[in-house]
Amino acid sequence: MALWGGRFSQAADQRFKQFNDSLRFDYRLAEQDIIGSVAWSKALVTVGVLNADEQQQLEQALSVLLEEVQANPHAILASDAEDIHSWVETKLIDKVGDLGKKLHTGRSRNDQVATDLKLWCKFQITELQTAVQQLQQALVMTAEANQDAVMPGYTHLQRAQPVTFAHWCLAYVEMLSRDESRLQDTLKRLDVSPLGCGALAGTAYAIDREQLAGWLGFASATRNSLDSVSDRDHVLELLSDASIGMVHLSRFAEDLIFFNSGEAAFVDLSDRVTSGSSLMPQKKNPDALELIRGKCGRVQGALTGMTMTLKGLPLAYNKDMQEDKEGLFDALNTWLDCLHMAALVLDGIQVKRPRCKEAAEQGYANATELADYLVAKGVPFREAHHIVGEAVVEAIRQGKALEALALSDLQQFSSVIGDDVYPILALQSCLDKRVAKGGVSPQQVASAIAEAKARLF
């Protein structure tokens, strides 16, 4: 039975009902709807709509219903109820009779669904923060185990300067720290309760909304009823958080896909996160990483879709807002799954140190060290930069590394170059010099790992 049938003389066309109903996806708000209903029943006692005995009956019935939902949430989908609010109310009436019909007094589905969704978002943020931290922990442990794994760092996908695999891992720890910070910021803004705002103008009952917000675990109550029932900023913010987070995971995946390729061959991925080819028996494909990269697009699409849904809506509630859930549910589930999968990829990854070092020694990644050497000898940096460029051209012509050039070859570009240049051009020297905070020197990387462990474990 619909919650709004008295005004209508004809039943809804079945095609419209299927188009209009939202139970198939908003059933996921069942627990939140029941929790909100328990709090609302307490509020109705304070204004004399319910007495204490009636409230206890309702709360007990709702508690039983909550247990049933937790045991088998998908059983809800067997109902032909319009939405989760209708389903909960119908089940409550089945349990307590006409008393259940009193619960919706002073409440609208507009403030009800806004409350349900915020409660769900709060729980989901906690889950996401946990998953972010678990991936950070996996990255830190991988970094700690690979502090001595020297590899090329890249700009423009060209070998640039030597780094370590540990330093690479720690870069993603920083990105994930920003993801967690954004989630925390989102939580602060959504932690206000819209319950008691009615359809748009506020409830006609003198309910203490601050007390009601406290019962539900919100920091406070919202300040304007029109805004409260139409606000979906938290949906946009969470979708934005997810979109940025998925961009980070997509970059992580792309890096490892390249590192795992035959062209780089820096890492081996575990058999547990790879698959084969139906035709080519030699293949070991990085499917987990490719799916992480691929799923980034659907999350970006959810953000774009929700932005377009909201952009032209007048105050206050409009049915368009029913479209706020499917994209949000899918995007946050996708982000959560990808966070877990990224951590699984790191569990069992093998860094191929000899190959990494070999690649770091190629591509003239120590050219900047030669420029710095010249600067230390009194050559202006811009001039030193030009000199080293010429030296690299000569090394390429001879098919040698910079450090393999004879001293006489180097001195044709600058007379200040002496025998002391060769230790400077050594791979380890390139790392050791990066001692400023955030640099790739062994001591800085070790310090960053220690700081991250203290913060995350």
Swiss-Prot record:
Q: Which reaction does it catalyse?
A: 2-(N(omega)-L-arginino)succinate = fumarate + L-arginine
Q: Which portions of this protein are annotated as coiled-coil regions? A: none
| Cellular component per GO, a single term | cytosol
Task: Read off the Pfam families from this record.
Answer: ASL_C2, Lyase_1
Picking any one GO biological process from the record gives: arginine biosynthetic process via ornithine
Q: Which GO terms describe its molecular function?
A: argininosuccinate lyase activity
Pathway where it operates: Amino-acid biosynthesis; L-arginine biosynthesis; L-arginine from L-ornithine and carbamoyl phosphate: step 3/3
Provide the top EC class: lyase
Keywords of the record, alphabetical order, are: Amino-acid biosynthesis, Arginine biosynthesis, Cytoplasm, Lyase
Q: Which domain of life is it from?
A: Bacteria
**What Enzyme Commission number does this protein have?**
4.3.2.1
Localization in the cell? Cytoplasm
Q: Which PANTHER family match?
A: ARGININOSUCCINATE LYASE
Under HAMAP family, the record lists:
Arg_succ_lyase
Q: Which family does it belong to?
A: Belongs to the lyase 1 family. Argininosuccinate lyase subfamily.
What is the protein's given name? Argininosuccinate lyase
What's the encoding gene here? argH
